[in-house]
C-alpha cells in the first residue's frame, strides 16, 4: 500500500522581455569596458531594457503567457504572489496591478520583496498556501523587475549586470503516490 505526498505542479510558464536590447557593445560607448571584459566576468552578452513599459506591464504580460500555457482563465486564479524590488508605486502593490491587468478580480494578491531570491520565496509561499487545503487551488507566481530605472550607468562594475523582464508560473497542488 503506497502513500500520498503533496507536491506542487508547474502547470504553466510564461515570460516577457521588452523589445529594446542593450548589448555589451552599447556599454563600451558609455563606460570604459569591452565586450570581452563583460563576458569573461558575467557571461552576459545582452540584456533587455524597457522603453517606458512599467514593471506591472512586464509582469502582466508574463502572467498572461503562463495562464495561456496552463490553459487557465483569470477566474481560475485563487492567489497572486508577485515578487519585485522595482515596483512602480509604493501602493498599490505590484500584485494588485497585475491582478487588475489580467482581470483576476476577487482573488488574494500580495507582494514579496526578497530581491534575487524573491521567486524562490514566492514558490515556497505558494506551495504552503496550496498545501493548506483551504480553498487555494491555483496560484499565479510572478517575478517582474525593471532594474534599468535604478542603474548607475557610470558604474562599470554594476551597470552591465542588470536588465528588465518578468517570468510567471501557474502552480497547482500535485498528489504523488509513492
Predicted regions, residues:
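Conserved catalytic cysteine-centered active-site region
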Residues: 37-41, 45-57, 85-139
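Short acidic, glycine/serine/threonine-rich loops at helix termini
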Residues: 21-22, 91-93, 151-156
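Active-site PLP attachment segment
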Residues: 119-123, 163-168
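Short beta-strand segments
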Residues: 11, 83, 113, 139-145, ...
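Conserved small/polar residues in nucleotide/adenosyl-binding loops
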Residues: 176-178
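Conserved "HGTGT" condensation-loop signature of ketosynthase/thiolase-family condensing enzymes
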Residues: 1-78, 102, 173
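Short glycine-rich or small-residue beta-strand-to-loop segments that form or flank ligand, phosphate
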Residues: 79-85
Amino acid at each position: 500500500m503506497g502513500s500520498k505526498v503533496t507536491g506542487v505542479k508547474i502547470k504553466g510558464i510564461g515570460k516577457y522581455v521588452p523589445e529594446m536590447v542593450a548589448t555589451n557593445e552599447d556599454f563600451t560607448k558609455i563606460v570604459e569596458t569591452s565586450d570581452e571584459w563583460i563576458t569573461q566576468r558575467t557571461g552576459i552578452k545582452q540584456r533587455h531594457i524597457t522603453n517606458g513599459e512599467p514593471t506591472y506591464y512586464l509582469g502582466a504580460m508574463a502572467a498572461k503567457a503562463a495562464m495561456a500555457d496552463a490553459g487557465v482563465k483569470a477566474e481560475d486564479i485563487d492567489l497572486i504572489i508577485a515578487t519585485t524590488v522595482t515596483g512602480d508605486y509604493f501602493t498599490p502593490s505590484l500584485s494588485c496591478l497585475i491582478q487588475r491587468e489580467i482581470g483576476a478580480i476577487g482573488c488574494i494578491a500580495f507582494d514579496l520583496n526578497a530581491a534575487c531570491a524573491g521567486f524562490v520565496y514566492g514558490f515556497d509561499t505558494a506551495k504552503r498556501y496550496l498545501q493548506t487545503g483551504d480553498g487555494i487551488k491555483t496560484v499565479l507566481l510572478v517575478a517582474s523587475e525593471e532594474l534599468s530605472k535604478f542603474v548607475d550607468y557610470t558604474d562599470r562594475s554594476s551597470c552591465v549586470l542588470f536588465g528588465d523582464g518578468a517570468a510567471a508560473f501557474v502552480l497547482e497542488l500535485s498528489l504523488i503516490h509513492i
